[in-house]
Amino acid sequence: MGDSGGESSLGLIAGNGRFPFLLLDAARAQGLRVVVAAIKEETDEEMNERAHVDAGVTVHWMSLGELSRLIEMLQREGVTRAVMAGQVKHKQIFSSIRPDWRLAKLLLNLRTRNTDMLLGAVAKVLEDEGIALMSSTMFLEPMLAPVGAMTERGPDAAELADIAYGMKVARGIAGFDLGQTVVIAAGACVAVEAMEGTDATITRAGEIMRGLEQEASTLERRLTVVKVAKPKQDMRFDVPVVGAPTIEAMRAAGATCLCVEAGRTLVFDREAMVAAANAAGIAVVGEAAGG
């Protein structure tokens, strides 16, 4: 049923993971009615349970390529503001997607097929239809990473050197929309994120180090993970996120330090993440943007 008060409603285009649920809870705490566009290929079915127990939540399931259906649903529900939250696997976007006529036309007009170009074009279509796409950190500013160490220990001298190098490399690849994460060991770049995501990149770095010969036993314990926002990060989508699963991937890979960009990276379940990092002896630090 439509809501004539667009300002009292929020559309939530939900991908996978906890991000959509955290944003949903924050929006409901602000008294907003939330209309969820749940992606069949990505969104956790727990979203249905939220709608069952909360009359202020409405869930509509649709496939990733159904742009026209998304717009029609949001307009029917009286939504004039929407957010994107949660990851959508890059391989889903660029290989598994079955676009409707509207999305197919949009894809044909893209100069390059990267995430920024695609989501920016989708945002423009939504805006043209009277639906403003808002920052995905809306209501979640307290979860943005602070400057400085978040854990009991900060980075040591070797890790600080790897952070400085990793920041240069990570910002370079992020500028080309290739990924946001690099893994460094003793001044050498071990792994660079592409389509696989941060945790898979960390896992791959650990596998690479284990596959090396004599020096691996030393270097494996010195893996430093650096994750950054893009130089011109659009906070409406693809904002960097870390959490307890990131720390678990690091622990399994033998990584000892995580550096993220303060004020531009969301830290989910910070208390649990920091506790896990402290237990594993991993340093977690926020670096000032542009620092």
Task: For every predicted segment, state its role.
Residues I39-E72, R76-V79, S96-K105, A200-G291:
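Feature captures the catalytic cores and cofactor-binding loops of soluble hydro-lyases/lyases
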Residues I13, G17, A27, A132-I247:
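Conserved mixed alpha/beta catalytic, RNA-binding, or beta-rich assembly cores of soluble enzyme
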